[in-house]
């Protein structure tokens, strides 16, 4: 299950980031050529024994993680409890058991979550350091010894992780549209969810939510089935202060992973923030449909040009999701909320759209004739043909003579051509290149 989350927690300097990087290897995709996607390395998609999960380094949640006060370590632990299925509690065999370790253990014991105690900086398994045995007193089971820096014991640790991952969640049918409501705290996510569920002809299912914390609300309207994944609705009163925005990214991430379409909610009185950019970047990189929902529009003083000016500002700040439609609503008054599901339906169609190979190549060949690819170091790029290889999101492979000759700016030209001719509003398009004749 791709949506299972595994968080690494522990006091500063126990090796959280080292363990994170060792497990992830080089598989973290940092996309350089997509401006506007700000990425900090706090999470990555991991896989072990055919089981997929998201690995989160809570230390990376705070830029000053090396010298943070314990109150912030506590916040990281609370964030992990709030959003994770399995928690790796990392301790340091070199320093031994510290009071902060006992504090963290106390919090984790109260949480009804799978916790794996991991003892780092054990350089040899032949003879355990005496400090190793002190950690048994934490009451969290036998510590798994590892050395994150040289990889010792990592395989055994991952074996244990996949054993503890939750069973598959409630499966929805392929036709069910999974909608994540994402955005920073206090932007009106719950208000929007409640307004949508209160609309005419909306029938809310009484199927209970899934095993994880985000509340799933299945419902139907006009014969179509939907599920709202409400990140604001991690209903247990979180002890995380809502003002600490960076921790809310974890909630958004859990919902984004499980969704088809994301409603990115922005506070009209603030405009898009760095936090919004980060959350939008996660949705974009995960290939989700995106609708920008500007809430609290009733609080804005308007003239004839307000919508145009605001749209321009949003487009500039979120330029990497320029394909996303923008809705101006008030969840409080209900203004234009009816357009949310209408737009979801349209984006869902685009998300599932297939273009026949013949039509696709007719359009692209004509565009390539008019604007041939530039030669790189004197060697011309030859584009032979293009195939659509997937949906959700629409994915294409361009077959060429030498893939390394394809410049990202020409890929962008191909993407723009696809959008101008076939729409794809609200969805990212994935384009890769292959040498002709390769499988």
From Swiss-Prot:
It comes from Thermoanaerobacter sp. (strain X514). Keywords: GTP-binding, Nucleotide-binding, Repeat, Ribosome biogenesis. Associates with the 50S ribosomal subunit. The gene is der. CDD domains: EngA1, EngA2. HAMAP family: GTPase_Der. Residues 4-169, 177-352 form the EngA-type G domain. The keyword Amino-acid biosynthesis does not apply. This is GTPase Der. GTPase that plays an essential role in the late steps of ribosome biogenesis.
